[in-house]
């Protein structure tokens, strides 16, 4: 615990909450929902602001605690109340105004849910969030994660390839607008969108210094860059080894490309990349970070 007292628990019941989609029987700490503004600037956690009092906001401003990472989801107050299942969630957006006026650096996040906050609602959210730039320095758009444990929860559907292409078109259009106005791309799509749409990853300069890396924005591009740089600094040799790399299904093709780059310098090393199917959480979960020991 990096705090002097207990963590503040979440007062929301978000329709997309991953903790609500976990199976029973795991360790107790995995079921704790935090929504603590102190963890935002200390550890980079995203907070909804519904748990922050006016006194908390003024303390952040007084001590200039930043950046504050805000989980927006929607800029439509009524829709935000619905998504967070909290009647105060819409009013909590007014706290963003106060942070903006005080010059507190912020990053934003939108967990996109099909048929809920995408399409016209996403367009409205991006339009409204753009007004906070460059104090709000970046916003990530990530697709909702859906496990097989959703009985009794809001009926959400996975995005299709066509959906992903439409989301990227919106984001790329806003990136161009924001770059021309502020010199930053501002809004960023997580890597999943590009993979799902079958489109190439953006070049490194489009990520504005990887401000949203922990949200899966630019992880694959950064990995590719780091592998190429590391290989370029080595002479290579003829050692014989067999290397097995386990990863999630989403990243597997990119990990294979990285292994091919390494193999050019180390031609006698045999690489095998194994894409792990997620049986624990369900096949819709394809990221490496949610692979469990039993699936390995």
Feature locations, PLM:
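Auxiliary Fe-S-binding modules of radical SAM enzymes
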Residues: 131-132, 145-296
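Conserved Radical SAM active-site core
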Residues: 1-135, 143-174
């Amino acid at each position: 615990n990096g705090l002097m007292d207990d963590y503040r628990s979440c007062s929301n019941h978000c329709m997309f909450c991953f903790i609500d989609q976990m199976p029973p029987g795991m360790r107790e700490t995995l079921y704790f929902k935090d929504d603590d503004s102190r963890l935002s600037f200390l550890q980079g956690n995203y907070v909804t602001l519904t748990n922050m009092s006016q006194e908390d906001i003024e303390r952040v401003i007084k001590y200039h605690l930043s950046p504050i990472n805000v989980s927006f989801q929607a800029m439509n107050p009524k829709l935000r109340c619905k998504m967070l299942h909290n009647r105060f969630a819409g009013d909590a957006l007014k706290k963003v105004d106060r942070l903006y006026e005080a010059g507190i650096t912020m990053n934003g996040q939108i967990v996109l849910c099909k048929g809920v906050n995408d399409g016209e609602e996403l367009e409205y959210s991006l339009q409204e969030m753009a007004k906070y730039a460059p104090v709000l320095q970046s916003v990530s758009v990530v697709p909702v994660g859906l496990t097989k444990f959703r009985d009794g929860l809001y009926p959400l559907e996975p995005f299709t390839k066509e959906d992903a292409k439409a989301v990227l078109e919106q984001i790329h259009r806003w990136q161009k607008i924001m770059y021309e106005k502020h010199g930053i791309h501002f809004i960023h799509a997580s890597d999943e969108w590009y993979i799902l749409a079958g489109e190439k990853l953006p070049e490194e300069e489009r990520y504005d210094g990887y401000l949203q890396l922990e949200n899966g924005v630019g992880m694959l591009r950064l990995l590719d860059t780091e592998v190429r740089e590391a290989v370029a600094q080595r002479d290579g040799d003829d050692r014989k080894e067999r290397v097995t790399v386990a990863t999630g299904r989403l990243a597997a093709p990119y990990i294979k490309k990285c292994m091919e780059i390494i193999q050019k310098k180390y031609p006698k090393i045999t690489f095998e990349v194994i894409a792990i199917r997620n049986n624990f959480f369900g096949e819709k979960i394809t990221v490496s970070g949610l692979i469990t020991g039993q699936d390995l």
